Regions:
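Catalytic nucleophile loop of clan PA
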Residues: 84-85, 310-331
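Flexible, gly/ser-rich surface segments that form the specificity/activation loops bordering the active-site cleft
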Residues: 22-23, 78, 205-208, 214-216, ...
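N-terminal activation segment of mature serine protease catalytic domains
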Residues: 18-96, 179-182, 186-200, 207-216, ...
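Positively charged n-region of N-terminal signal peptides that target proteins for export
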Residues: 1-4, 83
Length: 356
C-alpha cells in the first residue's frame, strides 16, 4: 500500500513538473516572440520601349490603381500580418502572402495591356486639358496681335506660352501613338516591396519605428515565408518558438499520455497571439499589443488544421500553440462568411522550409 502511494505521488510530481501550462503562462511566455509585420509595395511596368510606368496595385475588379509615370509619386500600398521568431539569428516565420506578391504571374502579365489602356486614357485626358488651354492661349494671342495696347514684350510672352502648349500637345500625341507599338509580350511587370517588423509591447507612431527585414526563404505552395532582421540578431528579451522534430499533434510522450488520462490532452485546446487588423487594434497607450485567443481543433488534414480560434485580417502568420506551448500550426486563412473557423498550416511544412 505504501509503495503504491509513493508510486502515485511520484507520478503526480512528474506530471505537475512538466505538464500542461496555464493560459496565462502560455500568453506571457509566447507574446514576446510575436511581431507585427508590415509590407509596403508597388508595381513597376517595364515597357518594351524601355520606359517604365508605376502603379499601386489592383482594385476588387482587377483594374489598376494609382498609375503614374513618376516613380517618386507612386503611392505605396501597406498591408499587415503577424510573424514570430524561430531562431536566435533574427529569423521570423510568417505567411508568404503577407510579404510577397499575391497576384499570380499570369494574371499580372495580363495587366500589361490594362496598363497601356489605362495610360492611353490618362494621356487623352491630359491632351484634352491642354487643348482647352491652347484655345484660351490662342484667343489671348489673337487679341495681343491685334491690340495696339499690348507691348511687343507682352505679345512675345503670350506667343511663347501658346507655342509651349502646342509643343506639349504634340509630345503627348506622339507618346499616345507610340503606345500602339508597345508589345505586351516583351514588357514586364515587377513587384517591389519593403518588409519590416515592429516588436510587441513597443511604441509605433510611423513607419520609421519598424525594423527592416529581408525575405530569405519561401514556400508559396504552403503559404509560408521566413524573413530575417538585417543584423541577424534576435533581441535577447524575445521568445523564440521551438520547432519540434516531430509533430506535437501526433506525438505523445509517456508523460503526455499520463496527463491525457488524468488531466487534459495537450492538444485539447489551442492558443494564438496575433495582430488582428494590424495596428488598428494593436495600438494602445502602452504601445502595440497582440491579441491572445483560444479555441479547439475542428478538423485535421495532412497539410492543414481547422480550429475555432476567432481571427480578423492581420492575423495571417500567427503562431498556433497547444497547452504545452508547442508550435502546431501557422495561421493563414479563415472560412468565408465567418471569423470563428480558421485554418493553419501544420508545423511540419515550416520545419521543412527551415531545413530547406
Amino acid at each position: 500500500m505504501k509503495k503504491c502511494f509513493i508510486l502515485l505521488l511520484s507520478v503526480c510530481c512528474i506530471i505537475s513538473s512538466c505538464g500542461n501550462l496555464s493560459e496565462k503562462e502560455i500568453e506571457e511566455t509566447t507574446s514576446t516572440g510575436v511581431v507585427l509585420v508590415q509590407n509596403q509595395s508597388y508595381y513597376e511596368v517595364v515597357l518594351s520601349n524601355g520606359e517604365s510606368l508605376y502603379f499601386s496595385g489592383f482594385d476588387e475588379e482587377g483594374d489598376l490603381t494609382g498609375i503614374t509615370t513618376d516613380k517618386d509619386s507612386v503611392e505605396l500600398v501597406t498591408n499587415y500580418g503577424t510573424g514570430f521568431f524561430i531562431s536566435q539569428e533574427g529569423e521570423i516565420a510568417t505567411n508568404f502572402h503577407v510579404v510577397s506578391n499575391t497576384v499570380a504571374d499570369k494574371e499580372v502579365n495580363k495587366s500589361i495591356n490594362k496598363v497601356i489602356s489605362a495610360l492611353k486614357k490618362v494621356i487623352v485626358a491630359i491632351y484634352n486639358d491642354y487643348n482647352e488651354k491652347l484655345e484660351r492661349a490662342q484667343l489671348a494671342y489673337d487679341y495681343a496681335n491685334q491690340s495696339p495696347e499690348i507691348s511687343y514684350e507682352d505679345f512675345y510672352k503670350v506667343r511663347d506660352i501658346r507655342d509651349a502648349i502646342q509643343k506639349e500637345m504634340e509630345e503627348y500625341a506622339q507618346y499616345y501613338n507610340s503606345l500602339d507599338d508597345i508589345r505586351a509580350s516583351d514588357s514586364e511587370i515587377k513587384y517591389h516591396n519593403e518588409v519590416s517588423i515592429a516588436y510587441n509591447n513597443t511604441f509605433v507612431t510611423n513607419t520609421n519605428d519598424f525594423v527592416s527585414c529581408v525575405i530569405t526563404k519561401s514556400d508559396q505552395e504552403h503559404d509560408l515565408a521566413i524573413i530575417q532582421l538585417k543584423d541577424k540578431k534576435t533581441p535577447s528579451d524575445k521568445y523564440v518558438f521551438p520547432i519540434d522534430d516531430e509533430d506535437p499533434l501526433e506525438t505523445y510522450s509517456w508523460k503526455d499520455e499520463i496527463e491525457k488520462k488524468i488531466k487534459e490532452d495537450k492538444n485539447s485546446k489551442l492558443f494564438m497571439s496575433s495582430f488582428n487588423l494590424g495596428p488598428k487594434l494593436a495600438i494602445t497607450k502602452e504601445g502595440i499589443k497582440s491579441q491572445f485567443n483560444n479555441g479547439n481543433i475542428s478538423q485535421k488534414t495532412n497539410d492543414r488544421l481547422m480550429y475555432s480560434i476567432p481571427t480578423l485580417p492581420g492575423s495571417s502568420g500567427s503562431p498556433v500553440v497547444n497547452l504545452q506551448g508547442q508550435l502546431v500550426a501557422i495561421n493563414f486563412a479563415g472560412l468565408n462568411g465567418t471569423q470563428n473557423f480558421n485554418y493553419g498550416i501544420r508545423v511540419k511544412h515550416l520545419r521543412n522550409l527551415v531545413n530547406k
